[in-house]
């Protein structure tokens, strides 16, 4: 039996809860401080009439000190009526998945040597290079920490890149995470070296890029109106489509093309197609240079509508035009350079993920619509997620989500979009609650936790936050790991439960 409290290289002041995770064929044990649930009720919002006994969890969108908490009913596997986990040991899990963490028990599909998407009986899936159905469960930002204690811990625990990545791959896979997401700065090539040396235990990659800023720099353009909020307007500038093709065919992508371990790529992050306080059409019309291509496009759009008054509907339509011009150029370039490389979109966030025009454009050209999903305790199964399915016949991937514990962390937690919760316990419950909702959604093909390791030191302008699966001594958070493992190990079985 392996206990997460037994590591002698743990940070001396770190006191994890008493969590015991079974190794091999030994079953894990629930922690003694598992909260007592309420009476059995029907889970909402839901696509199914499933009953559960909720626990009450506190959370806040504020940074500490938290003066007022909200509370929300929260669903965890232990208290789901009518469901018992099918997989309770590491050995059973390893026997049920392949090297990518894909199911070896669900019906096999055509093996193409690459990842692709497929809709089967109304549910979207990823299919891995071996033809196995795959639910994506990965972590973003796999990179070395830069603080002094990060460096000391890394040298003490690993010492070499080879040991770091082989250890990390093993530890992550043993809690059901099998790959990496965006922002693995300085690590992508190291991951590929690891994969080449360890073909039976790879880490998948989903590299992220910054097409708009790279295009601006390559062409010596300025942002429309001098503001990076208007970066999307660069798609109206000369050479956008041609540059996308040359960029994809160039050195930035050379290592990823035709690599079977590359899930796909993100071309940008959180493009500002609009926000609650700033509509893209208003911004482009406010550009003082009347010859700026972004202004010209916005003015021509308004003229075609015969009005000078911007409405939300007009803004949504125009944002869709901008998004389509963006996504079309990238996708057409992908088809010419490597037509089997999945295009994962641009990690829509905030307002844009709720804009029909933007989501329709993404669905038309992206293989997967990526969503950075914050500011919601539960997935919006009957509203936004249903809209995404109606607006775009494509699957979605949650490319970021997390919570941060603020009462048992040594970080100031003054940054980040993820909710604040009191402790690591609530982080664990939130993980299961949110991902259970995602598993109900037949258009969801997985998620990327943000992120691999906590911030530290000067990260985020010296406002580091508890975002990681790992702490700053390169140790997994035991409580979060336990509950993530239970969910991840049973993800395929839970899909069958929800789809029955």
Predicted regions and their residues:
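Active-site clefts of carbohydrate-active enzymes
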Residues: 217-233, 310-312, 350, 355, ...
């Amino acid at each position: 039996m392996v206990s997460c409290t037994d590591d002698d290289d743990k940070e001396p002041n770190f006191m994890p809860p008493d969590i015991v995770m079974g190794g091999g064929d030994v079953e894990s044990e629930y922690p003694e401080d598992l909260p007592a649930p309420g009476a059995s009720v029907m889970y909402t919002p839901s696509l199914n009439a499933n009953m559960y006994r909720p626990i009450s969890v506190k959370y806040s969108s504020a940074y500490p000190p938290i003066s007022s908490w909200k509370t929300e009913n929260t669903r965890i596997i232990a208290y789901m009526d009518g469901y018992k986990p099918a997989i309770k040991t590491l050995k059973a899990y390893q026997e049920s998945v392949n090297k990518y963490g894909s199911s070896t028990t669900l019906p096999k599909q055509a093996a193409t040597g690459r990842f692709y998407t497929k809709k089967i009986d109304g549910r979207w899936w990823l299919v891995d290079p071996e033809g196995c159905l795959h639910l994506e469960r990965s972590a973003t930002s796999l990179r070395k920490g830069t603080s002094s204690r990060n460096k000391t811990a890394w040298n003490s625990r690993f010492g070499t890149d080879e040991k770091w990545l082989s250890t990390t791959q093993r530890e992550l896979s043993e809690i059901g995470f099998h790959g990496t997401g965006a922002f693995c700065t300085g690590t992508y090539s190291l991951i590929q070296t690891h994969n080449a040396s360890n073909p039976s235990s790879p880490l998948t990659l989903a590299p992220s890029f910054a097409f708009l800023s790279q295009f601006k720099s390559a062409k010596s353009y300025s942002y429309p109106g001098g503001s990076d909020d208007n970066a999307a307007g660069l798609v109206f500038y000369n050479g956008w489509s041609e540059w996308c093709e040359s960029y994809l065919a160039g050195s930035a992508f050379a290592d990823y093309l035709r690599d079977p371990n590359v899930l796909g790529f993100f071309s940008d992050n959180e493009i500002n197609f609009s926000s609650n306080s700033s509509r893209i059409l208003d911004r482009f019309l406010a550009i003082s240079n009347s010859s700026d291509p972004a202004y010209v496009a916005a003015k021509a759009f308004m003229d075609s509508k015969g009005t000078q008054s911007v409405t939300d509907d007009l803004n949504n339509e125009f944002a869709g035009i901008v998004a389509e011009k963006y996504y079309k150029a990238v996708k057409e370039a992908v088809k010419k350079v490597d037509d089997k490389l999945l295009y994962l979109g641009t990690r829509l966030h905030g307002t844009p993920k709720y804009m029909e025009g933007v989501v329709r454009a993404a669905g038309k050209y992206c293989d997967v619509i990526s969503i950075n999903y914050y500011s919601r305790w539960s997935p919006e199964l009957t509203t936004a997620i249903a809209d995404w399915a109606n607006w775009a016949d494509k699957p979605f991937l949650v490319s970021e989500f997390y919570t941060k514990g603020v009462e048992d962390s040594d970080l100031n937690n003054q940054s980040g979009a993820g909710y604040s919760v009191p402790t690591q316990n609530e982080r664990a419950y939130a993980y299961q609650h949110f991902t259970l909702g995602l598993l109900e959604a037949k258009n969801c093909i997985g998620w990327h936790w943000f992120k691999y390791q906590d911030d530290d030191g000067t990260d985020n302008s010296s406002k580091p936050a508890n975002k990681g699966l790992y702490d700053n001594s390169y140790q997994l958070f035991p409580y979060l790991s336990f509950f993530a493992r239970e969910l991840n190990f049973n993800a395929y079985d839970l899909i069958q439960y929800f789809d029955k």
